[in-house]
């Protein structure tokens, strides 16, 4: 009778929520699946539940307990997540390799105008005074300047206001099943299961973006497992509702991947003479001293007091020339801190926006 009751409950829930695209596992037997196994059945929605079981089998191999895996039912196929992922991919225009690239001299400027508004700087100033205690604690503990923690918090989740309302397991399983980036999203699905298995959060609270990024930090599950930190000593790593933990996690991430709190991110420069585009980039062998760059005509764009202070700090370290819009747009000399921001998000546009946002926060607040 108990098995019939469980089955009836599952069927009723399926009817309410939309049937075939909902995983309703009640069996305790989840066979292990090799890490390298490839799903061979057609990627049609009627196979989605079977694919979820396939991923759970891989999670068994990764050490996730059967009890945790069996408790995670109602994993749904989210069509909107697939649509958003494909739309994002569609914004990257494929060009004919036999044709020269189309250059956009305003790419960096357009991006900054969109994401780094005066209103965002105003909000950052207001929020700074509200979160000063947890922000300073994270800054001091992990040796990361406050303005960079605040800038990442503001950019990633709009100061904690936008965290996403998607069920993370469903989003990750959906995007893995879609196949465009299966290796990434299947790995993140298993890492999300590990989070649940280690009691970091309850499933009902594990909400995030359509791509599975979570909390005020917008960490993917792998980033959570590697960098999430307990900022207030309560034993939890709550990046969703606890600012002590959110700021500690941001700072721990940067610190772990090589942040130096004695350095700024970089400065904007002007090129007073032609310079080969091949010299730009963040590869280690492209680093030069400030003196070497200046000898090649790379000069500060601004001579404000803030930029001069940054220039002094940058005069004792390796620097890289960054030209996000290739040979036609703006240029920047950046420190290794810029490279650590790229570890967070590999977009040069994003990294420049974080650096400039941090500069404006520092200037506005007087840090």
Model-derived regions, located:
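C-terminal soluble interaction/assembly domains
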Residues: 269-367
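Secretory-pathway/luminal and periplasmic proteins that interact with or process carbohydrate-rich
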Residues: 78-85, 157-166, 178-182, 198-204, ...
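Bacterial N-terminal signal peptides that target proteins for export
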Residues: 1-8
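Short, functionally critical alpha-helical segments immediately adjacent to catalytic or ligand/cofactor-binding
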Residues: 59, 68-80, 145-160, 192-195, ...
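C-terminal motif of bacterial Sec signal peptides marking the signal peptidase cleavage site
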Residues: 17-18
């Amino acid at each position: 009778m108990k098995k019939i009751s469980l089955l009836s409950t599952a069927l009723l829930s399926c009817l309410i929520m939309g049937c075939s695209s909902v995983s309703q596992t009640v069996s305790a037997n989840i066979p292990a699946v090799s890490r390298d196994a490839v799903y061979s059945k057609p990627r049609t929605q009627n196979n989605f539940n079977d694919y979820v079981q396939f991923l759970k089998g891989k999670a068994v191999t990764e050490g996730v307990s059967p009890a945790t895996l069996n408790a995670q039912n109602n994993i749904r196929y989210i069509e909107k997540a697939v649509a958003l992922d494909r739309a994002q991919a569609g914004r990257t225009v494929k060009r004919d390799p036999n044709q020269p690239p189309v250059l956009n001299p305003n790419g960096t400027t357009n991006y900054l105008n969109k994401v780094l508004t005066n209103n965002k700087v105003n909000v950052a100033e207001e929020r700074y005074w509200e979160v000063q205690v947890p922000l300073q604690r994270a800054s001091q503990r992990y040796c990361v300047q406050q303005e960079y923690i605040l800038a990442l918090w503001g950019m990633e989740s709009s100061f904690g206001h936008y965290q996403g309302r998607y069920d993370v397991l469903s989003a990750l399983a959906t995007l893995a099943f879609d196949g465009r980036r299966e290796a990434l999203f299947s790995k993140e699905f298993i890492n999300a299961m590990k989070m649940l298995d280690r009691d970091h959060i309850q499933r009902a609270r594990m909400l995030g973006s359509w791509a599975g990024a979570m909390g005020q930090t917008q960490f993917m599950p792998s980033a959570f497992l590697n960098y999430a930190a307990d900022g207030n000593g309560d034993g939890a790593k709550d990046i969703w509702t606890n600012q002590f933990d959110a700021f500690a996690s941001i700072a721990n991430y940067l610190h772990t991947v090589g942040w130096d709190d004695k350095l700024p991110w970089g400065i904007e420069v002007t090129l007073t003479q032609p310079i080969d585009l091949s010299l730009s980039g963040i590869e280690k062998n492209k680093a030069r001293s400030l003196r070497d760059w200046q000898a090649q005509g790379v000069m500060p764009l601004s001579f404000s007091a803030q930029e001069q202070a940054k220039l002094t700090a940058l005069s004792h370290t390796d620097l890289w020339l960054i030209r996000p819009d290739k040979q036609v747009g703006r240029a920047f000399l950046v420190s290794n801190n810029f490279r650590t921001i790229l570890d967070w998000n590999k977009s040069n546009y994003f990294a420049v926006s974080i650096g400039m946002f941090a500069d404006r926060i520092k200037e506005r607040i007087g840090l």
